[in-house]
Every structure is written in structure tokens, then in C-alpha cells.
Amino acid sequence: MAKTLYEKLFDAHVVYEAENETPLLYIDRHLVHEVTSPQAFNGLRAHGRPVRQPGKTFATMDHNVSTQTKDINACGEMARIQMQELIKNCKEFGVELYDLNHPYQGIVHVMGPEQGVTLPGMTIVCGDSHTATHGAFGALAFGIGTSEVEHVLATQTLKQGRAKTMKIEVQGKAAPGITAKDIVLAIIGKTGSAGGTGHVVEFCGEAIRDLSMEGRMTLCNMAIEMGAKTGLVAPDETTFNYVKGRLHAPKGKDFDDAVAYWKTLQTDEGATFDTVVTLQAEEISPQVTWGTNPGQVISVNDNIPDPASFADPVKRASAEKALAYMGLKPGIPLTEVAIDKVFIGSCTNSRIEDLRAAAEIAKGRKVAPGVQALVVPGSGPVKAQAEAEGLDKIFIEAGFEWRLPGCSMCLAMNNDRLNPGERCASTSNRNFEGRQGRGGRTHLVSPAMAAAAAVTGHFADIRNIK
């Protein structure tokens, strides 16, 4: 029977399945951070259980860390406790930890792929909703809760029901300057923030195949923002070339054997999806969210929508509420909306290609008066590479703040946050009320668009910046 990529990955990992029971899956990789792991390790301790497969468990610090100092005390008592607990737990249970002083420390979803921990064909879990990022490699990767974190630590397995399947095909070639962030925001604009609920999404089409691995990670990172369980891109030569030579990737003949298997991880001809969505890449322009969920998104050259234009009463009410929170009036051009802060970073857009794209706009320009702009590399290696290329100097000369790796202003769990009423052009993945700080107003954009907002002081079409 013809199978989708998701069905192949799921079936290959079933350890046990019985009638009227949820299948038990084997988990190949478990990524751990300081926020969702303390109670899980305490559960192991209380029952006298070891970590079943410490060699398949990798930990780092990211959510709570300061991006201005490596001092564990910098972000408050709760952050300090969580990080110290992670140090203690990893030492006690034999788990590899990339702590604040480790050169590989960084955002968990940047670190995993970078170190070759993430490989095609794997099942990967983490106590974080944006674990979908790793689906870019043709891996079945999804976020789990703290009780599930404990279960995986103890057994290296997890009960998981089968999801429905969705194919999102982006046909044709994207125009110059259109990034994976624009593509995925356009997709969510079409499906809505709940359009993928109950599904695993496979992204395909020429525009998707043209993306680098970093672009594919941005794409899959935001699958969760359309309500999907996770996102997938089938592995190809782009994938294999990215993985080859990385720290935890197979070497020599083992790598060749792995590639031979990875090449089978494609949706079979004739396989059927429960839902199919199609977009034309050439119709996608730079995207900016205007509301309080990622589905409330328009082209940079559009006007703020009028809630009255929504036929669905639920969408109309949601738009009214969003505009009130965001302090926006219907009908005004988006390019006239001024910003207070800019955040370039997060597990969505903090990799080297993202920083290069932002630096290209920043070079030779200055951050607009009254704007604070942060650039936060996703990991130690990203920071080191950016500095080797001189990107840090470009940003600093333009008036951006060059920071240490961490989740930073994506979420208000550290010192980087918005004050009430502040408006931010952000390369992160969520624009919910209060996500970046109580009363903060978040607009999601690509790295180049964020840099353009920083130097102009308002939203601007990067295609017009020469």
C-alpha cells in the first residue's frame, strides 16, 4: 500500500500496537532544556529510575538565559533555580549538557541540527512546542509535556495516536527576497491558525525544494502555528549535504548506508492525504502579521483590514479584539506603522543565513532614532561564524545590539522583553497577547524585514530598499 512520509516514519517506530490501544513509539532523540525538565527528573528520582538511554538525550540552556552575560543569576531566582537543577540532573543521570560556558550552548532547536543530533528518519521529542523544527530533515519531531518528558527519560518510548495527513504544496518559484518566513506566514494566512489541527503537514513543491535546510527549519518550526502536530520536508541532497560531517552524524560507510535508507523517506506515488492545500509561490510577497495570532497576516503593502470585511462572525470578533490590543486602526497602510523595538533571533530565525540576510539590509545604515534593535544568534557556533564573517561589526556599527545566544525576546521568560504598549518587529513565531511581555505588541516578519523596520523606524518593503 502506498504510504505518505509521515506514515512511513510512524510505522517504522512502532514498538507495540494492539487493538483499541494507542501505539507505543520508540524515540530516537530526546532534547531537554531547563524549563520543562526539572519535574521530570524529580519523577525519576522519586521512583529510583535511571535515564534509559542517556546517550540519546541531549540538554542545553536556552529559555531563561541572559543574552548579556553568562552569569546564571542574571535573569532572576526562578531562572537560576531551573538552570542549576538542569546542571544537577544532567550530572546525576549522565546526560550531556551544553551549559552557559559550553561553546555549543544555544536554542535547543538550533543546537540539535547543528551538531548532527537531528537526522532524517528519526523520532525526536522535546518539552517544547517548536520541536516541529526538526521535521525539516524528514524526521518525525514534536513537542511533549513534562509528564511525557519523564516517560521518555524512563523508557525511551511514548504512546502516540496516528494523526491525519495534510499536504501543503507551494508551486513555482518564489520571487527574489521572499524567504521561508514569508512562505510559511502566507501558508498560515491561508489555512488559519487552526487549519492544521489534528494533522501532520508535509510541505512540498518547487518553492520548498529550493529552500536551504535553514529555510526548511523556519518552515517546519511554524507548522505548529497552524495547529498541526508537526511539519515535514522529505530529505534530499540538500539534507544529506547539510548533515554530512556534523559531530553526531554517521561517518564513512555508515553515512553512505544511512543516505541509502534516507532516500526511501519519500511519500509514495499514489499515497493519499486527508487534506491538500496549494499555493503559488510567485504570488507571495513580504508578509507582516497585524493581529494576535500568526494567521492574522497580510502583505507589507496592504492596509490594516477592517473587521467588517470578515463574513465569519468569529473571525470578525477576533479581528476587532486584535486591533484593539495592537492599537491599530482599519484601513491605514501597514508601512505607516511605526515600531519601538526589533528582535532578530529565536528558533525560527537565528541561524547564520538569517543573520546574513539582516546584515545585508543593516550594512551602511543606522537604526532609526528611538528604536532598540537586538540581534541574538541562536547558538555559540552561529555567533562564532557570524563574527568570523564580520556580521557583528555590521550590526554594531548600524546601532544594533549584538547579544549572547538564547531564546531572548521570543518569550517573556528572561530579561529581554517588551514594555506595555511597545510595538516590535520580530523574527520569532508567536504574536499572542503578552508573548514578548505584558501589553507588548508583536508583528512577525522575516530577518530582512525586521532589519528594514529597524533602519526606517516603520514597516518597509525590502524590495524597495536599495
Swiss-Prot record:
Keyword annotations for this protein, in alphabetical order, are:
4Fe-4S, Amino-acid biosynthesis, Branched-chain amino acid biosynthesis, Iron, Iron-sulfur, Leucine biosynthesis, Lyase, Metal-binding
Catalyzes what?
(2R,3S)-3-isopropylmalate = (2S)-2-isopropylmalate
This entry's Enzyme Commission designation comes to 4.2.1.33
| Keyword Nucleotide-binding tagged | no
What GO MF annotations does this protein's record show?
A: 3-isopropylmalate dehydratase activity; 4 iron, 4 sulfur cluster binding; metal ion binding
Under the heading CDD domains, the entry gives: IPMI
Co-factor(s): [4Fe-4S] cluster
Matches recorded under InterPro entries: 3-IsopropMal_deHydase_lsu (IPR004430), Acnase/IPM_dHydase_lsu_aba_1/3 (IPR015931), Acoase/IPM_deHydtase_lsu_aba (IPR001030), Aconitase_4Fe-4S_BS (IPR018136), Aconitase_4Fe-4S_dom (IPR036008), IPM_dehydratase_rel_enz (IPR050067), IPMI_cat (IPR033941)
Q: Which cysteines are joined by disulfide bonds?
A: none
Pathway named in the protein's UniProt entry: Amino-acid biosynthesis; L-leucine biosynthesis; L-leucine from 3-methyl-2-oxobutanoate: step 2/4
* One GO biological process term: L-leucine biosynthetic process
Q: How is the cofactor bound?
A: Binds 1 [4Fe-4S] cluster per subunit.
Lyase is among the record's keywords? yes
Residues bound to [4Fe-4S] cluster are 347, 407, 410
What exactly does this protein do?
A: Catalyzes the isomerization between 2-isopropylmalate and 3-isopropylmalate, via the formation of 2-isopropylmaleate.
Subunit (UniProt): Heterodimer of LeuC and LeuD.
Q: What NCBIfam families does the database record attribute to this sequence? A: leuC, PRK05478.1, PRK12466.1
PANTHER family per UniProt: 3-ISOPROPYLMALATE DEHYDRATASE, HOMOACONITASE, MITOCHONDRIAL-RELATED
Q: Which family does it belong to?
A: Belongs to the aconitase/IPM isomerase family. LeuC type 1 subfamily.
Q: What is this protein called?
A: 3-isopropylmalate dehydratase large subunit
Organism name? Shigella sonnei (strain Ss046)
Q: What is the lineage of its organism?
A: Bacteria, Pseudomonadati, Pseudomonadota, Gammaproteobacteria, Enterobacterales
Gene encoding the protein? leuC
